[in-house]
Amino acid sequence: DAVSWYISPPNSRSATTQVYWQPGDGKKPARRGETSAVLDQSGKEVSTRETRGGFFLYRFHFDLHYMPVIWARYLVGVAAMFMLVAILSGIITHKKIFTDFFMLRFGKGQRSWLDAHNVTAVIALPFHLMITFTGLVTLAVLYMPWGIAANYAQTSTYQEAVFGKTEEVARSGQPAPLAALGPVMQSASAHWGGKRVGYLRVTNPGDATAMISVTRAPEGAIGSRGEEVTFNGVTGKPVGQSMAKGAALATESVMIGLHAGRFAEYGLRWLYFLSGLGGTIMVGSGLVLWTVKRRTKLPDPSRPHFGFRLVEKLNIATIAGFPAGIAAYFLANRLLPLDLAERADHEINSLFLTWLAVFVWALVRPSARAWPEMLGLVAVLFAAVPLVNAFTTARGLPASLLAGDWLFVSFDLVMLALAAGFAKGAHKAARKRVEAPRTTRRKPQEAMTA
């Protein structure tokens, strides 16, 4: 009795077929897993653990969590606009932006932090601009709906003008077998010159009014809105195709495609990842520099006021807390019982509970002690991910290397690299805490000598 099916066939990133369906009669499933299935190459359902995996992190970056989606997207939009303004104003005000790119001095204290901030900001500057601006474009209609309201009486009229009129046909109540999907996919692929099928949408399956819409995969095309061919769901014959994109729709499609990066091959995906990591370092080093520079200007740097202390605590919660939550999320995926009720929700809750725990720890501990403690915790958690993965599954790093499964190899190696980076940060923070009292005691002697 499903109203529609959504089918994603196997591709270079997945060996299984993903199937989702919309229940009929307005029914709403209690959980997402109740309206989805994973099929192997023979069409049999594969039993998988209940998880939202990386899809949650993808949705979290613009939908947040524990709050209505609409308000979350407004908050994300405000933050993205501030970021875009900060990047543009930074380019204008930073006179030595390209000169500083070649200045990276190690072991120079605050100077090294500033160099790291400048280098990570400049080296991926085109990416920072692109990802921020295109992120705003993806939700531009939500943030600026007035153009549509001023020119179209109804939103549906606008959608028909831009995307083409698509009439939803109600069920006739007359049963009819669905056409074989294999020949339909082959026909669509041939229409696109051999390009791969991205996904299929079947409306009114099992009814005489059934329709099959086949959308092209984004491979080889930056635009996010692939071409579409529609077939009669009973006869399997083509009955229509998507209209040619106008300039505005084509531009929007490219902007969203650049932001999502689904068109990218592995090399470009790694560049996206490393650029994003550089942006994270840029923000993190900026947060640390802000407190370091302002501490020296306080009346009594050893006893900062409440506002300054709060910023330090929030920095620890952000720089150490969120990565700790991510690592805990990965560990929960492997350690929670497979038959646990609402398992996917417990995985997500583990992320936020860990993040909260780090924040509470930062509140009750002196910042100088909390920094090495929490950075060390993050290092341990990330290092534990590949170890737990090896002991709880057949996808451990040695097994993945022998099998040539570079997707799992890359993931485990990235976890170990992050662990090493946070361990280095914990060591630096601990050494700085030990050296600080010595420096304080030495200053009066230096003053007397002078």
Question: Over which residues does each language-model region extend?
Answer:
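Long, internal scaffold/assembly segments composed of regular secondary structure
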Residues: P177-L274, G279-I281
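Membrane-water interface of transmembrane alpha-helices
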Residues: I87-D100, G278-L298
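Internal alpha-helical transmembrane segments
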Residues: I70-T155
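Extended, hydrophilic extramembrane loops/domains of integral membrane proteins
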Residues: P23-F62, E219-I256, I281-V288
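Alpha-helical transmembrane segments forming the membrane-embedded cores
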Residues: F127, T132-Q174, R303-R433
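Non-transmembrane, extracytosolic/lumenal segments of membrane-associated proteins
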Residues: D1-P29, P145-G223
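Short, highly charged, low-complexity non-transmembrane loops/tails of multi-pass membrane proteins
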Residues: A429-A450
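Hydrophobic transmembrane alpha-helix segments characteristic of membrane transport
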Residues: G53-F56, S89-S112, V234-H259, R295
